[in-house]
Amino acid sequence: MILQVQPAKLIKRYKRFLADIELNCGEETTIHCANTGAMKGCAEPDDTVWYTTSTNTKRKYPFSWEITQSQDDHFICVNTLRANQLVEEALHLDLIKELSGFNELKREVKYGNENSRVDFLATYNNAPDTYIEVKSVTLLESGHGYFPDAVTTRGQKHLRELMDMVAQGHKAVLLFAVLHSGINDISAASHVDPIYAKLLKEARLAGVEIIAYKAGFSLQLGELDVKLVEKIPFIER
């Protein structure tokens, strides 16, 4: 995925979906932030914000916060909408070997008993249907990656739905899209959401497959190339 981006300096994030930035010209403006999480370590004052500009002239906030370049020089994709796009791109490029060979890939398919939509449903000729839930990972603490960065009842529901798919004879995958250049392994954040961590352990024992792929970032002349490039370990802590 290639994004046309421009840099700015972060002043502060607030109201979840908004942040104030200082443009290179010195002007201050408000930017849209497509992230409802805590964004711990991803939104410190004076971090560099890389943003895209919408062509929709009716948008109140034409700039979208895509990437944080932290003061210790990590790249972090904070636009959570990009996770599914990156996974879809990687699946079609056959970069996620555990899920290769599908005939069809469908998005946002209704499933389960709790009125959910799975991120992707992959169908195969000689293998079970595969239900894939994608989660974006940006929380780095003490050299390790964690999910979630805030309590997520929605994420808890998705784990129950995935376990139900396994019980019905399907394949179920929880795919962590690791969008922080400093993360090299990932674990459940039991210190953030102990219920989620407990359900994740139950899901793994029930047969839900857990996969984590890390994004690579390349920035040249205002073009930012982001793609999932490396499998990293999921570690139970």
From Swiss-Prot:
CDD domains: SfsA-like_bacterial (cd22359)
Gene3D superfamilies xref list: 2.40.50.580, 3.40.1350.60
InterPro entries: SfsA, SfsA_C, SfsA_N
Record GO terms (molecular function): DNA binding
Top-rank taxon, per record: Bacteria
Signal sequence bounds: none
PANTHER family, alphabetized: SUGAR FERMENTATION STIMULATION PROTEIN A (PTHR30545:SF2)
Family: Belongs to the SfsA family.
NCBIfam families in the record: sfsA (TIGR00230)
Full protein name: Sugar fermentation stimulation protein homolog
Source species of the chain: Colwellia psychrerythraea (strain 34H / ATCC BAA-681)
Gene that specifies this protein: sfsA
